[in-house]
Structures are given as C-alpha cells and as structure tokens.
C-alpha cells in the first residue's frame, strides 16, 4: 500500500490552496441542554490539531470535515460540532470558525470568505444522509459537493487529507468518495496509528498479551479469531466474560450473556489451546443486585456467580481483585500489550476497580502498550491517567479492531492510488 504523506503535500506548497481535512472530532459531550453542551474528553481534538495547524501555518485555507454521534441524516442540536469547534478554537494557534452547514450555499459563502491560514469547521457531515448512504451514486454526489467548496474563489488545485483514523473503516462520502475526487494524502495521526498497529501485527515483541473487555463478545469475535495463534495470552474481562464462563458450563445469573455466541466461543477456546494461545478468564467477579451506581454488591467466585445473596438475579459488573492481580502479573511479564474494552462498568465508582487495575498495570509496565481507543481511552482518562502513561492511546476504536482483524479499511484503500 502506497499512501502519500502530509509532508509531500507541504513540500508541494499549500499557500492559498484549499485543503479539506477529514478530522476525528467525535468527542463525548455533557450538558443539561442540547444547546449548552461541553466537551468532556478533548483527546481526539488535541490529536487532530497538529495537522490542522501545520496546514494553516503554511498558508492553506483549511476546511475541516468531521462527524459527531449518529444523527439520522438531518440536523440535530445535540450532534452539532459547535462544542468541538469551540474547543478546537481554544486550543489552536490559528483562527478557527464554524460554518452553519456542511454544504450548500451558506457553506460555499463561508468557504469563499476564508483567508490564507484560516480554518473553517464545516457542520456535522452526518447531517446529510448521503454521507453514510449505501448507494455509491448518492455518496459520490455528496463528495462532489464537498469538493466544490474547495473551488470557492481559489485558483489553485485543492487537496484532501484524511487524518481521521477513527473513521477509516467507514465507506462514507467524506472518508472514501472524497479521497477519489482530489489529490489525496494521509495525515500524521493516521500515519502514527498505522505505524503503531503494524507493530502489533507484523512482529510484536513477546510475550504478547491482549486484554479484551467491553459489553459484547460479538463485537470482538473477528479480532479474537485473528489473534489466536498470534497473541500469547488473551485476558478476558468486561461484559463479554460471561459468555466465556457460560461456554465453560457455568451459570452467570442475570449478567450480560450472548447465548447465541456460546458455541463460537467454545470453538475459539479449543482452537486457542491447539494454537498455543492461552485464554485467561476471571476467577472472581463483583456481582450486584441491579445495574446502578448504588447497587448492593458482593465478591464471588467467577464459577459460582449465582452463589451470591442475589441468586440468579445477580449481575456481574466488574472483575474481582484476585483477577485484577492475575491480569496485572500477565501484563507485567509482557513485552507487548494491546488493551481494548473496560473490565467493568467503570462509570460507576463501585465497579471501576478492575479497569483501574489494568490501567495501572499498563502504566507501570515497561512493555510497548497500546490502549485501543473508544471506551478504553475514555476509561483511562476518566480514571485520572495521563495519556503519556501509556505507549500509545489510539483514536480509533472500531478502526483499530478492524485493522487487527485483517480487514480492508475503505478510507485507506481510497488513498492508495
């Protein structure tokens, strides 16, 4: 795969040129009103900033494309990029403004008024249903409108930079189709993510330990299958652990269970044993009376969840201290660690201990460590860990997993030309 770099674009010169940058501004927000929201984790904004500033500093007229959340193809106040754009403007050393629309007359007017070295964030691309359309023609038409924005008063050829690694697994108009319409390059963030993930897939230093958590085992099946025979150990926590316990014949009470995946998990356990990959499952679990921050809870053996005072109504919400210690020892002995998915409901203080223990073990480890984006990145920041405590915190949750699954990523395919 041959991808053109940002340095190549800068060497070619961007003074006075429009450069459309697909950034990842899909950040968590909080607030009582849809119109009074603030960014609670600006990690992705900070990660997107260097490319935007490099281009603006070199005299480009930067048009930032991004999405936030999952709007249903129409404007919704709670999904506006306004909070993200405001935070970007606070952090940036160059002028940043927000357009009221993504395309159309008002967006064209705002783009035409952009001066060299200025940045315009276009409104959420997913406000247009064509962004995520399965119809190739619809997506291509929307991409053409986006490309047209770069022709607003400019006499130099526009360019496209994909710096949204968290979206490269999507065949969307601003990720795939737009890259086919303009000279295209990949940004520093995408390059860094690829370099890091290739260390995990090409020749990881061993022992190579993978820590998987999160709610559903079905979300991780493909990556688990691809890791069998490649990872030395796979540590399983989070809601997905209960399907593994059920596959071993244990009762799991009212814990999250994907019964339709039990046979698949049984198959993976057998294949892993034959391939020399060991699954390390919890030996103790924190079981609660209900899914709530203030729920009564007890520590029980993982193989006897229904032995708690809650009986079959008990819900497992975190791994226990014995498991946390065992996982920490595995991480301490590793040379390479990839972690994706929290160990429990970290948003509730009573059930955050397992996730905190894994994060601390990674922070203390001398191994090359990668925190796989999404909920894992949010968890370590929520629990007070600095980004530099880990080797790398990925901005791509789903994209990272699909890369490790060996899947083709449309956003990268479009750049390979």
Curated annotation (Swiss-Prot):
GO terms for cellular component: cytosol. Keywords: ATP-binding, Cytoplasm, Glycolysis, Kinase, Nucleotide-binding, Transferase. SUPFAM superfamilies: Phosphoglycerate kinase (SSF53748). It is found in: Cytoplasm. ATP binds at residues 220, 316, 347, 373-376. Monomer. This is Phosphoglycerate kinase. It comes from Renibacterium salmoninarum (strain ATCC 33209 / DSM 20767 / JCM 11484 / NBRC 15589 / NCIMB 2235).
